[in-house]
Design a protein with these regions (language model features):
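Short S/T/G/P-rich N-terminal loop/turn motif that feeds into the first structured element of a domain
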Residues: 1-35, 39-45, 53-57, 77-90
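A short local loop/turn or secondary-structure capping micro-motif enriched for an aromatic residue
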Residues: 13-14, 67-69
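Small, basic N-terminal interaction modules of short regulatory proteins
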Residues: 49
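Short, electropositive alpha-helical surface patch
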Residues: 58-65
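Conserved short beta-strand edge segments in small beta-sheet-based binding/regulatory domains
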Residues: 68-79
Length: 90
């Protein structure tokens, strides 16, 4: 399953997040796959796409970062999957 993660850096400060990432890596458990991310120009927020079969892996990953960021999780699908899913209802 694909998830869009909205990651808001605590106090709008990305430095602690990037410092930990530099020193420890992504800290993702086995089975959670990072696909891509985009960061706002003011470094206040990051939008990531992650993939995993077990939502518990995503929760485990977020727990490792919750002291530095707040998370919103939105289950998403690719546009191709959306076309296939809605086609029978058109």
């Amino acid at each position: 399953m694909l998830y869009l993660i909205v990651e808001r850096f605590r106090d709008g400060d990305a430095r602690p997040v990037y410092r930990r990432f530099r020193d420890q890596g992504r800290l993702a458990p086995e089975g959670l796959r990072y696909l891509a991310s985009w960061v706002t120009q003011d470094f206040a927020c990051c939008y990531q796409v992650m993939e995993c079969e077990d939502r518990a892996l995503l929760e485990e990953w977020m727990a490792r970062w919750q002291d530095l960021a707040e998370f919103e999780v939105i289950p998403v699908m690719t546009s191709a999957d959306a076309v296939a899913a809605i086609a029978p209802r058109l």
